[in-house]
């Protein structure tokens, strides 16, 4: 597995493969998966974190089931663009995943993604209890949708 740049994503996908989005938290991992056309992000489950080996095995099962070729993972930068402890924890998680999968990862700036996801759930009138269980997968979908939009723009610009 390698960490790749957003402009390399298309070259790493086989026909029919999807892209996964992850929102890595201390206790949970929000998961989203694109459609096969790489246009829409769809929230999936929220994984309750246990330990790396268990989390990695569960993620790989999801990636296999969803035919994932690339993973976009939110990088929680500080508002000034600097890296803090959460960004370092995300980088460490991706480095540790190298032992479990060959699927490449892309870091994606996730600043304000959770706020945007919560606002979206509020607009859909989702109850507080349901918001708490859905916020991480909604944030993953928001992260993934931003990356998908960028991929579409790159593809459009290339002709």
Swiss-Prot record:
Please state what class of enzyme this protein is.
hydrolase
Question: Which Gene3D superfamilies does the protein's record reference?
Answer: YqgF/RNase H-like domain (3.30.420.140)
State the protein's purpose.
Answer: Could be a nuclease involved in processing of the 5'-end of pre-16S rRNA.
Q: List the disulfide bonds.
A: none
Q: Which Pfam families does its entry note?
A: RuvX
Q: Which GO terms describe its biological process?
A: rRNA 5'-end processing
Entry's SUPFAM superfamilies? Ribonuclease H-like
UniProt-listed InterPro entries: RNaseH-like_sf, YqgF, YqgF/RNaseH-like_dom, YqgF/RNaseH-like_dom_sf
Q: Which species is this record about?
A: Bartonella quintana (strain Toulouse)
Q: Under what name is this protein listed?
A: Putative pre-16S rRNA nuclease
Which CDD domains did the record assign?
A: YqgF
Which domain of life, per UniProt?
Answer: Bacteria
- Family under the similarity heading: Belongs to the YqgF nuclease family.
Cellular localization per UniProt:
Cytoplasm
Q: Which keywords describe this protein according to UniProt?
A: Cytoplasm, Hydrolase, Nuclease, Ribosome biogenesis
The record's Gene Ontology cellular component field reads: cytosol
User: What's the EC number here?
Assistant: 3.1.-.-
One of the entry's Gene Ontology molecular-function terms is: nuclease activity
């Amino acid at each position: 597995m390698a960490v790749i740049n957003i402009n390399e994503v298309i070259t790493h996908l086989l026909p029919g493969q999807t892209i996964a989005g992850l929102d890595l938290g201390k206790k949970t991992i929000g998961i989203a998966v694109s459609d096969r056309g790489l246009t829409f992000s769809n929230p999936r489950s929220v994984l309750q974190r246990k330990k790396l080996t268990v989390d990695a095995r569960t993620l790989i099962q999801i990636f296999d089931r969803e035919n994932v070729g690339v993973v976009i993972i939110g990088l929680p930068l500080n508002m000034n663009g600097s890296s803090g402890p959460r960004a370092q924890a995300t980088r460490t998680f991706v480095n540790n995943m190298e032992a479990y999968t060959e699927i490449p990862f892309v870091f994606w700036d996730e600043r304000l993604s959770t706020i945007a996801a919560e606002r979206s759930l509020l607009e859909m009138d989702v109850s507080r209890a349901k918001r708490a269980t859905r916020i991480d997968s909604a944030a993953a979908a928001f992260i993934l949708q931003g990356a998908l939009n960028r991929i579409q723009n790159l593809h459009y610009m290339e002709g």
